[in-house]
């Protein structure tokens, strides 16, 4: 990709702040059109692989495909779905999300990111493009602020914050719901607290309520599978 990474982030942030059509919305709309095409032609909504191929070409055509991962900064961590980098200025976390928790199409991914930004605006995601991770998988490039000088939240703090936000625990606290969205994986390693007591939900899994999210999560999550083996 042409241009300096920090310059692209700055430009994308300006577009985001100005309320213009951001990459997240554009990519979501494009993926939805692919879904509609496949459903009309083949009568199925199982089209994740096709969507990823088409999204890569779309990103290349739109100038938001990253060829060089070194632009993201220093490799930081690898989770179940994210390859994580710390930006060169150490102000942002860049996640290459491989769409693991989208089952047969990408609809739930885009719904999830939009829901995250609604509930947790202090650590909202910006989608700045797409790239391949170290395993060669097509990924969304997601940018979050880096939360420095923070500690891990306790289970009680996480519970209290969800109650404050209008959520209730389900399945013995395995996830929280407000009837519109179900939020999984809000455990201490994914929720931080700053020195003023503010909680930051930096990495959760969200599904629209009533769409079988718990089954999808349990089938795809290493954490859930690990619990199942111990029982």
What are these model-predicted stretches?
Residues 1-72:
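Juxta-kinase regulatory segment immediately upstream of eukaryotic protein kinase catalytic domains
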Residues 45-48, 69-122:
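ATP-binding glycine-rich loop module of kinase domains
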Residues 86-87, 146, 193:
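Conserved hydrophobic "DFG−1" position in protein kinase catalytic cores
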Residues 92, 140-142, 182, 200:
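Protein kinase-like catalytic core scaffold
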Residues 93-100, 145-147, 203-205:
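Active-site ExK catalytic segment of metal-dependent nucleases
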Residues 98, 114-173:
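Conserved structural core of kinase catalytic domains
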Residues 101-111, 152-157, 210-213:
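Active-site-adjacent loop/helix micro-motif of nuclease/hydrolase catalytic cores
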Residues 176-231:
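Catalytic activation segment of kinase domains across protein kinase-like and atypical kinase folds
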């Amino acid at each position: 990709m042409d241009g300096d990474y920090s310059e692209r982030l700055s430009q994308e942030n300006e577009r985001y702040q100005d309320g213009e059509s951001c990459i997240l919305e554009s990519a979501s709309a494009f993926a939805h059109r692919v879904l509609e095409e496949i459903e009309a032609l083949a009568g199925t909504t199982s089209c994740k692989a096709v969507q990823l191929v088409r999204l890569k070409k779309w990103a290349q055509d739109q100038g938001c495909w990253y060829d060089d991962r070194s632009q993201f900064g220093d490799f930081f961590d690898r989770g179940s779905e994210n390859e994580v980098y710390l930006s060169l200025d150490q102000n942002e976390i860049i996640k290459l999300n491989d769409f693991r928790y989208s089952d047969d199409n990408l609809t739930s991914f885009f719904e999830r990111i939009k829901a995250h930004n609604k509930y947790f605006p202090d650590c909202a995601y910006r989608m700045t493009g797409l790239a391949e991770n170290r395993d060669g998988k097509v990924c969304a490039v997601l940018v979050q602020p880096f939360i420095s000088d923070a500690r891990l939240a306790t289970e009680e703090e996480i519970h209290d914050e969800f109650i404050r936000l209008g959520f209730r625990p389900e399945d013995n606290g395995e996830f929280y719901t407000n009837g519109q969205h179900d939020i999984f994986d809000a455990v201490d390693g994914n929720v931080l607290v700053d020195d003023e007591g503010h909680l930051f939900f930096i990495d959760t899994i969200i599904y629209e309520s009533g769409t079988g999210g718990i089954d999808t999560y349990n089938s795809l999550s290493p954490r859930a599978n690990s619990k199942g083996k111990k029982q």
